[in-house]
Amino acid sequence: VGGDGIIVSKNNVQITNLSTVVGGNGGSGGVAGSAGLAGAGGKGGNGGDVPIGSPTTRGKRGEDGAFGENGINGRVGNGGAGGTAINISADGVILLNQGKVLGGTPGSINAQPGEAIVVSGKNSHIINDIGGEIWSSGLNSKAVEYEAGADNGIFEMRTNSIVDGVVDATKISNSKLVLGGNTAKENSTFIASKIGNGRQYQGFSNYEVNTSEGSTWNLIGETTALTPWTVTEGTLAIVSDHSLGSTDGALTLNGGVLQTVLNVNSDRRFNLTAESLNGGILTDGDLTLTNVISGVGGLKKTGNATLILGGQNDYTGRTIISSGNLFLTGEGGIEHSESVELSKGTSLNISSTTGGTMVNNLTGDEGSHVVLGDRFLTVNSLADSVFSGEFGAEGETGGLLKTGAASFTLAGQNNYTGDTTVSAGKLSLSGDSNIEKSGNVRLNRDATLDISATTNGTMVNNLTGDEGSHVVLGDRLLTVNSLADSVFSGEISGNGSLIKKGQGDMTLDGINSYQGITRIDQGNLRINSDQSLGGGNKNNSDLIMNGGGLKIFGSFASDRDVYFNADGDISVDKDMSSSWNKIHTGDYKFTKSGEGELIVRNGGDASEISLMNGALTLINLNMNSEKQDALLNVNNGVLNIIGGDVSAKNDLIYITGDSTINLDNVSIKSSGNGMRLSDNVQSTLSLRNQYTDMPILVEGKNSILNINAGDNTTLASNMHKSDESTINLNLMNNSSNWVISQRTDVDNVRNSGNIIFSPLNKSEFNNLNIKGDYSGGNGTITLNTVLNKGGDKDQQLSDKVLIKGNVSGETVLKVVPQGNGDNTASAPGNIFSSRDGISLVQVGGDAADNAFKLDREYISTGTKSPYQYRLFTYRGDQVDQQSNFLGDKPVNVDFRLQTAYLDSSGNVVPGVDPDYNNSNNENGNGTGNDNGTGNGNGT
């Protein structure tokens, strides 16, 4: 056998070969013997070991061969085997080959060629460096052979190195084949099909790329061998997953780069070590991974092509997308990754996931993208993060779910139309970023939406929030677009303002502290306390009605003013009462609805108000309208006006439903009707501390107006009614006055106050026509009467009270006399006649004799007049129907003024006292009874 070129027997040494090491050549065979004689032995090989039937010696000349047998039995002796170039028997040896290693040549063609390198020691590391060559010496020899027990052996080849012959690691465990390199940037190729049983590289347990940064090993060809590759440094480039061997072998990224040159599909596991982010995956072709990526490391993606992940990955390090696209599909996810970081021009695409996915601590540069499709992305914020890219492309229906206690900031343009839910932590918007296309924005308890860093505020749709949630405005403006009804029970804070848009109702039932205004443009804003509208003072936190409505479902007092920039509605729920400082409607209409009460405490100004329901109290309000419509439209409810000035170009109050109007010390002016009722309405007008001369028109069918004149009231209104409507008047006490200046038709009157006929002239007098009943509550009626002869109807010049119904109670008649007086007694024999005198009150129903009486014994025209007009009562058949002023209703009781005097016996005598003495009548009043008896005869 040829001798070994180098024998390494010392542990843990490093050997560098810069020259050529050749194993000893085997000795040549002996010469064949002649026939019949023994042949001579062959000459020993130089430098090798030649066995000639005896123990070998190294480096010596071979012994002669034994003689051959006689005759034909003679033969040539076999040559010696080639020697090993380098024999490593020690442990921990590093061999750096920068030269040439060649096994020894065999002594004959039948002898064994020598191996280049034989390793029997453990933990060896053979490096075939750039330009290094390792050659076996023949077909059956090996370039490198690891003998049994030489475990943990590493064989590394570098760029432009040569290995000719088999590298056999089949007898050892934990062996590794390394594609290495030095500091130079090189591009090398390794053929995967050389790996496997019967191939050049046999028996390795592990495979590694560990070359210099920037250097690339191109792995081409295919193998079915189990080749679990680890890329530690440098780049491993593939065109097919088959180059990586059986899919049972995982690929580990340990700081190096896996590059896909073409589109590659892989079903193998990937492992990421703590060093993985020093390398990553470079996709020049799309890479689809359907198995799981695991490990404590992170995933860094470069290259313009797409990385597609379909496995339920559980690696825990960062995910960095430096270029290209990361595409998640099916159940694919990266929810265990510490963070997801997108560079400019990159994207995270979840549109093909089964049900959306979750990422932690999402960040993105301007120009990055999150593609949602119709899926929802959950962003779990374990630390504060900012995404400055586009979250959701135009028209995408997916949405955002924010979890985690930290803050997630959207700083780019977001176009997704699905919901935004902040389950925990804070979702912040900054700059021009907004989520105004998101269908709904929901905040869970303790979650926050922060818009304080936006340029000009933002808009959100259908904002909802649990109790304990927060919206932080800073000094910005939040617009809530309510496309559907929503409830926000959290707190809105900051110096900013709130605008409500959209046709849906938005409910604020939390305690808010924002300092700015609240403006309602569309739909309804529902509140239950003044704090629902923030904590600002009335100078900077007013409520502005800009086309929408306010619905109140709580009782509270507010110091805010309410301004109307458009027609608007304020509704108060049943059993609730809400008061405000002032209202300012401008030229717009304010509508009060709901069954509760709304109070305006300190006036303001208004041009048109409609009360649809409930109660509305206006205190010291100035109302002035040039509109043709009514100033106050009352459909239903109670309208209280206390103080202030109210004037209208047309109707002042138009009533279309059952209602009550209470006026107290209001200055009223109307060019049209002061009050007008439509069909089928029952309404009450109550007056207190009030003077009003507004005309009252009850024109509708089946409508009823009840007028209550209370303390310190003067009602000077002209009242008109249709035949099918009703006016009932109640003068409640002796400070209640009703001044009549024209013919007036009413239905029922209760008089505990004063009815006063306004004086006109000697030829014009008015009638009070009462269609129904009259109740006297010790009130008075003041009438203007010309004291003349009377008699015929056209000669009875006086205001009259004409009652078609019944009369109850008592009333005092105060007659304001005109004229010179005359003797009304015209009947022969100087007797009482129901045709004589002047009728003041006619009753179609029943009335007691004392239902009406004068405020004195008699009326005269002056202190020296001989004519004493006394009030007499005629009833039934005694009534002269030719003096009927009731029209189609016969007069049943007629109260008439007639001249009469008391004779010396105290009897009432018709006519004039023939013994009249001026000295008895200095004051024009008698001293006898007020009225005659019921039959018209004096008592």
At which residue positions do the language-model features occur?
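Thr-biased low-complexity repeat/linker tracts and other Thr-enriched repetitive architectures
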Residues: S351-V386, S430, S452-S489, S493
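Outer membrane beta-barrel translocator domains of Type V secretion systems
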Residues: V912-N923, G932-T939
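Glycine- and acidic-residue-biased ligand/ion/polar-headgroup-sensing regions
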Residues: S215, V231-L236, G256, G303-A305, ...
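Extracellular beta-strand-rich solenoid/capping regions of secreted or surface-exposed proteins
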Residues: G2-N11, I86-S89, V119, T273-E275, ...
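Parallel beta-helix/beta-solenoid
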Residues: I15-T20, E208-E213, L282-D284, V296-L307, ...
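Extracellular beta-solenoid/beta-roll
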Residues: V119-S137, K142-A148, K171-G221, L226-S240, ...
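Glycine-centered low-complexity coil/loop motifs and glycine-rich tracts
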Residues: V1-G5, L18-N87, Q98-K122, G131-A150, ...
